[in-house]
Amino acid sequence: MAKKGDWVLIHKIVLSPEERAPQVPDDTKKVPLEMWIKGYLNEDAQIGDQVSITTRTKRVEEGKLLEVNPYYTHDFGKFVPELLKISEQVREITFGGEGNE
């Protein structure tokens, strides 16, 4: 359960596919324009509830509650063995070895 004042992430549909501008490319027109916003929760709620938040710039927005205390996650994907081999080859060429003399 999320409490009033918690830092949260919400999701909101800004424009449905039918509301998109005519000059938008066809593949873009097929999907809604979505927005994810972080802010302080204005009332107690459960994940999935429609809630209102106040952003750091004091805007009040409404949307579906997705996460409490959201954080950034990032990685470079799964290990690729070929890149390790290439790294060894580059090191050999750059810093010496029989083939580099």
From Swiss-Prot:
Alphabetic keyword roster: Transferase
Superkingdom, taxonomy of origin: Bacteria
Main EC class the enzyme belongs to: transferase
Pfam families from the UniProt entry: OrtA
SS bonds (residue pairs): none
Documented activity regulation: Completely inhibited by p-chloromercuribenzoate (p-ClHgBzO) and acetyl-CoA, and partially inhibited by N-ethylmaleimide.
Enzyme Commission no: 2.3.1.263
Kinase listed as a keyword: no
GO biological process, one term: ornithine metabolic process
Keyword RNA-binding: no
Catalytic activity: D-alanine + acetyl-CoA = (2R)-2-amino-4-oxopentanoate + CoA
One Gene Ontology MF term: transferase activity
Cited function: Involved in the ornithine fermentation pathway. Catalyzes the thiolytic cleavage of 2-amino-4-ketopentanoate (AKP) with coenzyme A (CoA) to form acetyl-CoA and alanine. It is strictly specific for AKP.
Subunit structure: Heterodimer with OrtB.
Family of this protein: Belongs to the OrtA family.
Protein name per the record: 2-amino-4-ketopentanoate thiolase alpha subunit
Lineage: Bacteria, Bacillati, Bacillota, Clostridia, Peptostreptococcales
Encoding gene (name): ortA
